Curated annotation (Swiss-Prot):
Localization of this protein: Cell membrane
Full protein name: 3-octaprenyl-4-hydroxybenzoate carboxy-lyase
Binding-site list for prenylated FMN: I175, Y176, R177, R189, W190, L191, R194, G195
Gene (UniProt): ubiD
Organism encoding this protein: Klebsiella pneumoniae (strain 342)
Primary subcellular site in the record, as a coarse category: membrane
Amino acid sequence: MKYHDLRDFLTLLEQQGELKRITLPVDPHLEITEIADRTLRAGGPALLFENPKGYSMPVLCNLFGTPRRVALGMGQEDVSSLREVGKLLAFLKEPEPPKGFRDLFDKLPQFKQVLNMPTKRLRGAPCQQKIIQGDDVDLNKIPIMTCWPEDAAPLITWGLTVTRGPHKERQNLGIYRQQLIGKNKLIMRWLSHRGGALDFQEWCAAHPGERFPVSVALGADPATILGAVTPVPDTLSEYAFAGLLRGTKTEVVKCVSNDLEVPASAEIVLEGYIEAGEMAPEGPYGDHTGYYNEVDSFPVFTVTHITQREDAIYHSTYTGRPPDEPAVLGVALNEVFVPILQKQFPEIVDFYLPPEGCSYRLAVVTMKKQYAGHAKRVMMGVWSFLRQFMYTKFVIVCDDDVNARDWNDVIWAITTRMDPARDTVLVENTPIDYLDFASPVSGLGSKMGLDATNKWPGETQREWGRPIKKDPQVTARIDAIWDELAIFK
């Protein structure tokens, strides 16, 4: 499935009953969040609020509010098909040369997909049908949502921030929330290790005193949006990955006021700059943990130009205690992670990030254990292999007879196969999510690994328990007479 832009995707969703138009006037201040939250928790459709109170621009919410809609956005029919996306990423992360003619033939589809990686640069684009600049720039005319009662101000949530470091050819796309503080001012909340922040740091070192160009795209096509939240290899741009998902090159256009390239079909683009030293206190905001976060200082983004499509749609979301849209994205992207991990660690059978663990803070791994200490190796591998898991506080490792996605199984393994002193790994002074207020120091805390596998010689000196198994012949005999027994009739 190929979607040229967000509107193509919305047309498909509406045809499949996955989009609901809301014509009743609804306030972007708290009310849209209340409706979107109730709808998402019920597994409902994406919502297009056509008449937000006080605004002439519609608001799109819950676009990726079910795992299936995430899969559709990636060009797949269902969530299970996302494993194929993961296999492609695993191949791109560590490509292997063909071993012979047959292997070359088998790999041809992957090599063919790589041809769609370069971007296609356009001279003009839908996202520049209207250009607003100078004193006419007014972010207050966009229906930016206030999601929770104690939020500091309206908050942009789904903006794709485009940056480029002074020594880099490829651009970085990142999603960072942005607090509205003036008609042309936003606070760019990016953490120091994220791509945009690193580009900014390099720029300040190379061009002291000069303004750092930044652009933010809102309402891009689904492949580009999802490319920005998927674990693409560092050598692959998000635009290139979006081209792989879509099956056609990503169309981009040069910004009006800077040399950055943005998705040509985006609904809205904010162009501007960040100046070194211009900071502002950001927050508090309710976030994906279910709590309001601390106030901290981040750079100020000054918007000099707004370009947009005719009849532009504002794409937004809310974050709160799971389930929310980030948690749903986590469930779907979980399937992408599995093949990537399995390529590096073939012994891994399954990998699961429970949504109630705030998408990434707890992971359950099942594996085919082969030697003493093997579980701890896998544990350390999860923390170090992909940067997405450096904030995972808890890793539980079980044998392959345990269903990683069934808490009944996992808790049984923990309580029967673990000795707390022997099988618990504690690692101190590691990177922790800035939003994790439970850590003793902001951004620095500990991690815990739980080895809930059967223990091998060298790990225990005791005779290990043998799991109870039914006699299959008895089971077959009872199956034959079960209906006759009429126990539940």
